[in-house]
Amino acid sequence: MGRENELIQAVKSGDVGAVQKFLAKFRTPKSKLLGSTKRLNVNHQDADGFSALHHAALSGNSELLLLLLEMQASVDIKDGNGMRPLHYAAWQGQPEPVRLLLRASASVNAASHDGQIPLHLAAQYGHYEVSETLLQHQSNPCHVNKGKKTPLDLACEFGRVKVVQLLLNSHLCVSLLEGTSKDPTDPNFTTPLHLAAKNGHLEVIRLLLKLGIEINKVTKMGTALHEAALCGKTEVVKLLIENGVDVNIRNTYNQTALDIVNQFTTTHASIDIKQLLREASGILKVRALKDFWNAHDPTALNIRAGDLITVLEQHPDGRWKGHIHDPQKGTDRVGFFPPSIVEVISKRLGSTLSRNITVPSHQHLAKTVLTLPIQHSPGSQLGINPDTSVAGDRHSVGSESSVRSAGSGQSCEGQQINTALLIENAQTMDFGSENLQNCQTFPGPVSGHHLSTILPVEKNPGDYLQGKDAEQIFCWLRGFQMETYVGNFISAGYDLPTIMRVTPEDLTAIGVTKPGHRKMISTEIGKLIVADGLPQQIPVDLWDWLSQLGLPEYHKQLSENGYESLSTVTELTWEGLQEIGIHRLGHQKKLLLGVKRLLDLQKGYPIGGTLRRRILGSQDTVAVVEPPENGDLPVTPKLLTFQGAELSQELQSALTRGNEQLCTGRRSFSQESISSRSQGSGHSQESASSYPVLPVHLQGVDLNLPERNHPEGTDQILQNHWVPNGCLIQPEPPAPPPKPALKKRSLSACRYALSDGEPEEEEEKKIATAGTGTLSTYATLTRRPGRSCLTNGKPEKKVQRSQSFAVRARRKGPPPPPPKRLSSMSSAEGQSPEGQSSVKTIAAQLKDIGRGTGFSASTSKATDTEVLEGSGTRRRTVSESAAGLGGRLSLPLTTKKDEEEERKEEPISSQHSSSESIPFAEEGNLTIKQRPKPPGAKLEQDATSELSPTQESQLQSAEAQRHLESSAVLAKPVTVVLAQARPQIAAKPQIGPKPDTGARAPPATSIPKNEEHDFNLTESDTVKRRPKVKEKEEESPKAPLANNSPSLIPSQEPLTQDTLIAKIADIDKRLLSLGEVEDSVKKTGIDTRSTGVSISQTHLVISGPQQVLQKPSRAVTGPLFPAGSILWDEESEASSREQTCIPQQSISNSDKGPPVFTSSLQNTEELQDTRGKSCRETVQLTKNILDDISTMFDDLAEQLEAMLD
């Protein structure tokens, strides 16, 4: 049969001429005896069942089809799949071959093995003309293939819009839409709408919905909404919801469309779909009260009385768009109708869609608008300062993530228990005159003239049907002409209590994109007074908690996602809310605030707890006064810092002290310094006296104010009636004369500190004194070590100190890189800034010394404040370590009288550390948090760099005298009180002054038993550093230091006289060795014109196995040291005095007290000549070093200033 195969190949290749030759040979039969059986078989089929006519139909060649049909080729021959030539012609899509086959009487409804007729193929591939031809030849559009699909199903599945239109225009349209030829119980049952929704064909869906297909038809997978949601077709979901699909229908797996999205989809589109589905759950259901139709409006909905209407949206022109489903006929109608003809019959949990919706006028006429009463009490003032800073910050609850949705509008989910009517703009709202009278709006921007108190919002299911939240927010915004943003707040899920938590980022997210409007709204938000709407007691369960928050619609959502109890709901985060589908910013904030309140209630905090509202101005001042002298502290709850750490006892008592006296608002030097710095740095700020604080008179207002959006650490307490036991600030008297202008270098460094202090804080606190009975200390509160609580919690009694907190905003922008560390000095508590100083302070101290400024030595006694005065120009000493480590060194205390006398004589520039061990520093200093370089002399560079020639000459002469006195250090009187072991006292050491010139110490001194104190100095209690250059030099043996090997070891056992003598000899030898080695690197800072003998106290610092002696930058003169004090003397720094005698130590023992040391005098004039020359050389070397370091500091200051600019 080779000829038949040749024919098939010729047809397959489309060779019409070869086919004609083949057919011509066998067209006329020859009358031969044996030739009649050799006729050509035109219906021959190959291995796949294809005949020549199959190939001709598939190729679409009409000539070949005609030739084969003339040869009587079988038109309905089937291949291996049961496909006929008409199937292939319909699949190929050319109408002429289809017509030829149909004229040849091809079967139009013959099905293949898979049940498909030619119309299935034509419809699936969108061949409109072929489909039309088949339909004209009575093809059955309701024919179902083995996949239970009709040609319409295939056309809808593949989005063949024209074919769908063609099929739906046929006489079998109703049957196609109803699926009468299908078995609904079949697992493969589906509808055209399901297939179109699954594949996202919007136009096909619109055609089907237009022609009335049942939108809620359920298959095994659910409704068409289930299919679209599962496949991530956001626009289809939206279209179906708009056309009234029931989002609560469950499939055979008991899943709603939202359940499917939550469980099976992770795409970005699923987020929008979740939102749409949640919105749809809050669609309003109404019942028609009377018939309605409008023949002149094609978009009007024909309504009969009693029809159930699903409200889809509320149009800006006042009409509502609704959907009516007729279960009997299986049809759905969508159109517009007036809201006056319906009544509400159901309120689903959730809210309306975030569309442009207005409150209909009839509801305002029928319902009473919630009023905002304005209380006009005689003499009442607004309870908030006019200068209150209301700008929100990043740390408010929920705002750390508000930037995520900027510009998105925060599409919404449930608004409390039911539907809130959204308002597009206030112009479309048709309030009646009587309603405007009831709704008392603010007479203008709330600027402090009246107390505008908004009553707490009671939430019940009927409130939001009247648009109560919308009306409240509208009345509030209308007071300052911002009513156009009502819809923004409502659609984002805000009510008035939650609006008070709004930050500028949140305003941007909800659509307030104009900076001026954001600023105005933020200002007015700060002046709102409204209950926080948070639980006042621990809820019973999750439902109770959500009900108190007014968000019970989320109970099911939270429960289904694993938050079934209060213990688990406290772990909610913003990410968790996003994951479970709560996207409305207002609801996120309220839930997270509710979690915070729940935690506070569980921890036993008072109502308000850590969510207390914080309102402060740009530089308000709150006075903090120490407890009374008797030490009695009021019984109040413990106060916490913004890190959650407990405040020191002094601050606890000060912040909770009653109104025993009015705190004077005297302008402090620190505030002047802040003002001067801000003028130079571009941060112009008003002083604390810019606005007087008005008295507050609140009537019936809940004082549990919510948290304000201000930087953490600025939790200031509202005064007078706002917070009990507050303190009112009075208008300030005229400011004292301004301080001298600051140098630019120090100013730049200070700006760096203000912007690089606390990474997560917007502002830094300035601490300064405001009292009149004691001298003030001006310091900068910087980062606490490790963000922990204060180290020394017990204040010193009978030392009244008033401190005030002022606020200065730091500059925005990325922080500059940290300065280079210059040393490895550290302590167990972390680096404390007491021992650091700026260039300005070093120079100022040396200038004062050069002019001869000193202390009057008649009655003053050196306290811990003097120890820290010059700490900026030297390393940390024992006294500083005791302050920074919270009193680890147990050292003697002075009496109250001595401290008060010395405090009264301190100059204004005296600076010290507070007794609370707060890491204070000097005013204007502590600008660069760095440690000194290992060389001991490299922190005095700025002092020498700014000295005048006269001061330099004084410096050289002082160096000469220093060498003379350092050699005779053993001859100086040293009084060391050593006692048996007893509990350590958390206090600072008392430094005793040196006796006057010519005075001789008594042969023996007796110390009473009650004056005894411990001296416990171990390496673990002191500051640890790497060995300095000086210390390395000490390791090389020298002739005078041959026996200088023992070290000071703390003794915990009773000491005998012999032991004491041996230990004192060791101390003396160590002092001498260190004095000789350090004389080349010590700075001079002594009064050159004083007539008394001035000494510089040196404090013992442990560094490894060695002991280093440090001296302060200021000399102190005074009488004999009092009993109970500790004094280590290194070398005197007198520059031009005549020293005729040097004390020499001797030892005596007292019967009633521990051994003490007295001294005799020794003439040392011959040592002056031998030391003078080497001293001058050392001074010159030191000056060169200081000049180099000064240049380095200048470069660093310029670099920091450039970074800040």
UniProtKB/Swiss-Prot annotation:
Residues 281-347 form the SH3 domain. It comes from Xenopus laevis (African clawed frog). Residues 1009-1037 have a biased composition (Basic and acidic residues). SUPFAM superfamilies: Ankyrin repeat, SAM/Pointed domain, SH3-domain. Keywords: ANK repeat, Repeat, SH3 domain. It comes from the Eukaryota. Residues 468-531, 537-601 form the SAM domain. This is Caskin-2. ANK repeats lie at residues 48-77, 81-110, 114-143, 147-176, 188-217, 220-249.
